[in-house]
Amino acid sequence: MGKKLLIVASKRYGDYVKEIAESMGCFEEISFVDNDREGAIGKLEEVETFYPEYNCAIAACDDGAKRLEWNKKLEALYNIPVLFHMDSTISPSANLMPGCIVEPRAVVGCGSTIGQATVIGANTVVEPYSFIGDSCTLKSGTIVKSTSVLEIGTETEQGTVLFTPLTSKQ
């Protein structure tokens, strides 16, 4: 059985997530489950009924906390993938947790960790040895300077430059 992906609770971001998944070339079928999307194969309350026909699922909500909440529900049945556009650059030593979505031309540097259900926007740069918490949304063009630590749920605006080093308490 090949990989089949459900994109859940996506609203308008779902089309972009589908294009990212398609660029990877590893899913034989990609469908939507949503209450407000024309062409969805089912409603949110029916999401469990698509297992085992679909073996992968990912939440694509705009809101980071809801994305994380949905992925936690989905992981009871489904594999939660990391989706990264083939035009992104991810260091082999970077650690991307389940539910991450990496948009085109984003760069994730060596030794960096990207938390669950985090979106790395197009043209965003996460410099080496940074830690990005769960359910963050780094919008297009964000730069996270080396060794930065971003808290759970951080959301940036386009073009933001961040340097938030881990500070030790003495």
Labelled PLM ranges:
Residues 1-86:
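Terminal amphipathic alpha-helical/low-complexity segments used for targeting or macromolecular assembly
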Residues 83-170:
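Structural signal for interior beta-strand "rungs" in well-ordered beta-sheet cores
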